[in-house]
Amino acid sequence: MDMESQKILFALSTPMEIRNECCLPSHSSPKMYLGTCFFDLSSSWGIDDRDDLLRTIHRMIDNGHAARLAGFYHRWFRYSPCEWRDYLAELNEQGQAYAQFVASTAECCGEGGIKAWDYVRMGFLSRMGVLNNWLSEEESLWIQSRIHLRALRYYSNWRQYFAGYTFGRQYWQSPEDDHLPLLREFLARKEYDDSGNDMFYQLFASDDAYYPTLSWQPLAYYSACPETLKDMSDL
């Protein structure tokens, strides 16, 4: 795969580069980080080896945190305003809080909703597989190419993709469901934390922002599934 195509695939997980700047991230490295030879995924992900990594990616690429809100986004883009109001009236208070969050973010992130939250993290895991010597570069690039095809299907540009990631991150940070007043307030606020501000500045707002330099289109070539990943060929 040519370097420009690799750069596009690596960009899918760029927000995670910014979250761990102490590891000396690189936009062009298959390993993501130049300042470490191993990245611990055990404490935060429960991943200790290649098999754990592949199982997690296979499970979460389409059934991660975004799955819980996917139905709301699907309906918002298809229902008339009257149908949406009727739908809200049928939901419990928790469901209404999430539906209102979706209604207020849908125009920014499109029908993909917060799928990018899962795509960014699965791209990150794919690159950590190379760093930790669990995946070959060929295997990692193939997995990232599957993520890229999904991103192109659900988002129109890098800004939409990043919005999906950002709102997904906020959803992930939201309080437990049984604290409804706090949940509603948190979801309504839609504020970046310091890490989110850094991401937005570096990726979009600075003079040398990264995402505006990248194309949003299919790659010239998508490789076949490596034989070593035949159990994941359905991705």
UniProtKB/Swiss-Prot annotation:
Top-rank taxon of the source lineage equals Bacteria
Family the entry assigns: To E.coli YbeU.
Query: What is the protein name given in its UniProt record?
Result: Uncharacterized protein YbeR
